[in-house]
């Protein structure tokens, strides 16, 4: 049963993170007028799909990513060229609405035509010889029109609906929006957790065994007001004061039953592992703070949690990249789907709150990792847009596509190595 719970939790976490990321791309793409033929969650064979307006929404078998396919985001060419024989369906204005490439269709009242000239990007027309009168005709293509092959519809994308032909700013927004939406999701989750759990105060809720707070006699309900020379008004002040006092003997003042008392104690030094490549030294008294539920403090606390988590993850990612050049790199620094599954298994056992917190951190991590300037990632593609903005011309399309393909192969190889390393670490 625990495996089933972990699998369900993993699928939900993965689905939420990828859906939010890809929706960010699609949201800004559509705002810029870019046609998005497909929105996919997962990779590999399609297991479910539905069409809404011009976009086909699909869920695919392998939980290793997702994508938004945008018109003009590659070297794909229209499947029709002069010399081909196709069938066309016309509307009441005598405009082409469907170009049928085979006999696997259910359309009626269609015309067969041998294509002599055609343009699917700018002038939108087909000129050719029709079978019914063996005469040459010129047909305009409707703005909303489709290629039909094997029963599937692919909407024709004029040049002004293609990603490649947009200005740098909408391109940048479209590419950056994926990571941006991951950051927004993380922030919302952190704030939501703060509202649910309340924000910590400087009042003691519970003391830990064999820690300085217990040894000094602190009790539930004691409100800490000063540590050394540092005044305390909220829980963050406790952490800040202890960072300065470190593990030196100090005086702690607290209020109990309306009276101010003081004790001397020595904070305990602890090491908290944040990621595979970074840890944090903290000095603690060893007490769990009481929480309060207010209207605005959770927003501030959520922002703080987001900034702290983002800083730690950014530092870890920079450290990992630096280790590639300094010789300290290890695949243990990375987690693939198998490693994330293992982490989810551990977090699920701690409860739904821990799972939500882990999802928030994972969302930040996904956003930051996608901004690494590797051609197949959002960060690498943003570099191409920056080049276009600076030099007032886009990177050669063939060169860009080749570089992105090399980057994609590199990422696939890395993913395979990371996955094998995760399997070896956790299951062998």
From Swiss-Prot:
Keywords: Cell membrane, Hydrolase, Membrane, Metal-binding, Metalloprotease, Protease, Transmembrane, Transmembrane helix, Zinc
TM regions (residue ranges): 172-194, 309-331, 352-374, 401-420
GO molecular function, one term: metalloendopeptidase activity
InterPro entries: PDZ (IPR001478), PDZ_sf (IPR036034), Pept_M50_Zn (IPR004387), Peptidase_M50 (IPR008915)
Cellular component per GO, a single term: plasma membrane
Names of required cofactors: Zn(2+)
Active site location: 22
Annotated membrane topology: Multi-pass membrane protein
Amino acids binding Zn(2+): 21, 25
Major localization listed first in the record, in broad terms: membrane
NCBIfam families per the UniProt record, alphabetical: RIP metalloprotease RseP
Protein name, UniProt field: Putative zinc metalloprotease SACOL1281
Organism: Staphylococcus aureus (strain COL)
Organism lineage string: Bacteria, Bacillati, Bacillota, Bacilli, Bacillales
